[in-house]
Amino acid sequence: MATPRPGAPGALRTAVLGGTGWLGRHVCELAARRGHHVLAVARRPRPHVAPHQFAELDLARASPESIGRLLREHRVDVVVNATDAANATDGWARTDEDLADLNLGLVRRLLAALGTVEKRVRLVHIGTMHEYGEVPAGTVMDEALHPRPVTPYTRSKLAGSQAVLAATRTGAADGLVLRVANVSGPHPSPESFPGKLVALLREAVATGDRMPVTLGDARRDFVDVRDVAEAVLKAVESTATGQAVNIGSGTAVDMPTLVRLFVTAAGYPAEILDERAQEVRSLGGAWTRADIQRAAHLLGWRPRTTLAESLRDMWWTDRAEHRPVVGR
């Protein structure tokens, strides 16, 4: 296992790019609880990042000079790049150029910015298990697997991760790439599959109708967003560098099982579902199951939240936020 950074877990000045997003907000919250100084960076502020220092920056267009200036002004020790072109605001309606601009272009500009900062700033870059591309069903996907992504999204994510790894291996940067499986848990991005499930069940509960859901035959690895945030913080506080690390549950679940588990974990009978089977558009491969041994050995990380707990908390967090106001 890699040793912690000198003084860790002391107070590190941690900038979270994409700090208002699904994963970013959980990283900000956990980093603050750990005693780190958090700087959330995003295009616009959101209420849930109010407890943290915030810097407004359009990362899709920010120059290396503006990023470097931000890092110097706030004396940042660690940058977490939690941005993703398939984000909560814009969804998946992106051109290939848009995907490349953020998933790769931002990484290149960020690496250039790190080179202008006098002190060594650590980088934890959030990639995706879908960078590996299509693999045969049953494959346990470890980091030795040669990536072969086929979609514009996954190719752009891989290119960003490879840029970070190349910089760390040449000594131009210090840090890790975390390749994260599909995510579940509280505050999902509206355009994500879990986010759409929450919206569909919310509508069904409000109207008394059945919950229509279109399902493909994919089997995916789902990991709770809070467990991912824990992995990110372990990477922040580690000295390990120059490696990709898979972050997942280590289990593949088929989509019908996932949906039924979500509904029953929320407290409703599976009969509420109106399931429709057909091919579903996806950003990644039809099978993912992460080998997470490197995360255990290098970072001392393992997932702690069951899928049922993750889906239950995802639903009840949403219910608390959308509870009708009595008397109005």
Named regions from a protein language model:
Residues 137, 165-220, 225, 261-262:
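NAD(P)-dependent short-chain dehydrogenase/reductase
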Residues 14-34:
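N-terminal Rossmann NAD(P)H-binding glycine-rich loop of SDR-like oxidoreductase domains
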Residues 59-102:
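NAD(P)H-binding glycine-rich loop region in Rossmannoid oxidoreductase-like domains
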Residues 81, 108-150:
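Conserved Rossmann-fold NAD(P)-dependent oxidoreductase catalytic core, especially the SDR/UDP-sugar
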Residues 41-45:
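N-terminal Rossmann-fold cofactor-binding loop
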Residues 204-328:
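C-terminal substrate-binding subdomain of Rossmann-fold SDR/epimerase-dehydratase oxidoreductases
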